[in-house]
């Protein structure tokens, strides 16, 4: 099993110093690079302090200059906020700058609040259509001159300048949850990023079943790489289990606000809504969070990861950004690198 790191620059309150956040994030990425992580992912979000990522290509170019071998992924470029020519050129330039380390992840976006500001009138549930139109256009632009007449974009003949270093193009990933996205990924030979949120292991099993169904319905297509992401925190003593759980509950209260457009945002800081008022409140029970998320001592984490490995998860994504203190984040990553990853070393 290979390992990926997903990390954001995050400020939980106005008291958090941005320069310290910047330094900490880069140090975490450098730890992952030195520790043998396969990919590090940068997100795209707008006007939110909890995920400071207005342009993933800029973030990854920054990380590329300070790392040696780790691959650099967008997770994800939000298709409705971009034009295909912009994305093709930005991605190709990053691939050149990083000496061919780009992993290109594309998706449809998550928060209705962002759509209301970045693409007024678009419902989050309809945004997948933009992703499915954009990706073939980007691949064509990487190959040469191409004109596009689609539902959402139209442009005369153009090409990507520059072209990607990797041939025929960088590895492509799509964020997938719904069956239609798994079918699209298999048909277009895209790797799959899955995120079961706070749900139990059965959610991962469901995603893998959707992948198998898509493969069965598209004979002749090869199986893409399948990754699963979880909030992750490794700690020294079992009695510390509530530290990441409490941090996760605070962040998830902000996530639900943004996902459901159910609360306010003050100068970039989302309010935390009352999780007990939600229909899905059982998903945020502390003991369930401890069980379902990748929280535990090194030995406990190894046991949890064995379940993912046995299911057929190819790569696990360590989601580091859950509002923990910087010291706790670094200790967690250190324990994961030194005491967990060696148990999954490839022969």
Residue ranges and their predicted role:
Residues 39-63, 78, 115, 195-201, ...:
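Glycine-rich, proline-tolerant flexible connector loops at the mouths of alpha/beta enzymes
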Residues 3-7, 40-42, 72-74, 102-106, ...:
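Hydrophobic faces of well-ordered beta-strands that scaffold small-molecule active sites
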Residues 32, 36, 44, 63, ...:
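Conserved, mostly hydrophobic/aromatic
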Residues 7-23, 77-85, 166-176, 232-235, ...:
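Active-site mouth loops of central-metabolism enzymes
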Residues 124-161, 202-313, 347:
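An alpha-helical appendage that flanks or caps ligand/catalytic pockets
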Residues 1-72, 167-170:
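N-terminal beta1-alpha1-beta2 module of alpha/beta enzyme domains
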Residues 50-74, 130-134, 333-347:
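Alpha-helix-loop-beta-strand connector modules within alpha/beta enzyme cores
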Residues 2-19, 80-148, 192-193, 198-205, ...:
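Flexible, glycine-rich active-site loops centered on histidine and acidic residues
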